[in-house]
Amino acid sequence: GKGYQVVFGVIIGTGVGGGISINQKVIRGRNSISGEWGHIVLPGRTEEEKKYVKKCYCGKNGCLETYISGPGFSSAYNLRFNKNYNSHQILEGFINNEENSIFALNQYIDHLARGLSVVCNILDPDVIVLGGGMSNIDFIYENINDTLKKYVFTDTLETKVVKNVYGDSSGVRGAAWLS
């Protein structure tokens, strides 16, 4: 998020989390949960989507984490298609033009966009930076910005979703920078 005033940093990996930085200062909030968007309910959940997701470890139903974390992505795929694949196998299927994997990844991007639309509508960040293992899927960046535009309140969304610069070490670098 270098060079931006309002940054929403996202982790999509084993879990889902986030952080907010305004004018290069991390915003923690009264309860120190600022940016904890993994436990908002996926906006606009359909009955079909409710069928193919497990209850979140936090005890609630429909948390974004159960849809867009790596384990959530593979769990939803396995429930829908009666398989036992991990996210890497699903992505391999996508690369090989396997129909179920293509469907799953397009749905993943839609779920990610719906979750990020809440962030955009409330925070209106300059940029959203994705990190974590799932952020390494290049197909996300080919589609997420256009998909996000369908769900935000404005017709002229300027916020961009971008990949982190430092790869899997981005979180460690950020923590070190803050200490």
Model-flagged regions — what are they?
Residues G1-Y4, G44-S179:
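ATP-binding/phosphotransfer module of carbohydrate and carboxylate kinases, centering on a glycine-rich
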Residues Y4-L64:
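Glycine-rich phosphate-binding loop of actin/hexokinase-like ATP-binding domains
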